[in-house]
Amino acid sequence: MIEKIYRTYLEIKSLNDLNEVKRPTEDYSINLVDPIDFQLNKFFYKQIGKKYFWKDRLEWSNQTWIEYVSDEKLSTYVLKNNEEIVGYFELLFHKTKEEAEIAYFGILEDYFGKNLGGYLLSQAIKKAFELDINRVWLHTCSLDHKNALKNYLSRGMTIFKSEILKTKIA
């Protein structure tokens, strides 16, 4: 079935514009994945993405995953509750444009409803601005979690582009 998908691009241009959500408890931490671990990125992509029709990377070989996570422009961060993994985000830095893209972002379904999305997004934005950039951006679509767009806007991001795509959903 062909379906209309609404894609929205959002940005934040200053850390001063961030409406930060603080860490829920001391049990939660944000950790840079170092050394890189393509299996972790692959796990999150599959587990979080299965509900939201993330498909473009499903056919990637392990070698393609390794090359992707080895790119010096990419940083992956994991949200943990003590030692249990909860969610993640991938930051892609575009040095020449002095910007960072939140390429992928999400929380495992077992942790839905715990108000962790706002905290994770706040941390993604803060980590991106640590590298002296002028803008953090991302895109979301109507297939993503029902609270995704609300979360982005609540953190201080603004819409800079919208589009309608037609795609096959199966």
Q: Over which residues does each language-model region extend?
A:
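Short amphipathic alpha-helix that is part of the acyltransferase structural core
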Residues: 22-57
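A conserved beta-strand-loop-helix scaffold within acyl/acetyltransferase catalytic domains
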Residues: 58-60, 72-76, 80-99, 103-107
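Short acidic/polar active-site loop segments enriched in Thr and Asp
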Residues: 75, 134, 158
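Short hydrophobic beta-strand segments in globular cytosolic domains
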Residues: 86, 159-160
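Conserved beta-strand-loop-alpha-helix junction that forms the acyl-donor binding cleft
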Residues: 112, 138-148, 160, 165-170
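Conserved glycine-rich acetyl-CoA-binding loop
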Residues: 108-122, 131, 143-147
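Conserved GNAT acetyl-CoA-binding A-motif
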Residues: 128-140
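Acyl-donor-binding surface of acyltransferase catalytic domains
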Residues: 1-29, 34
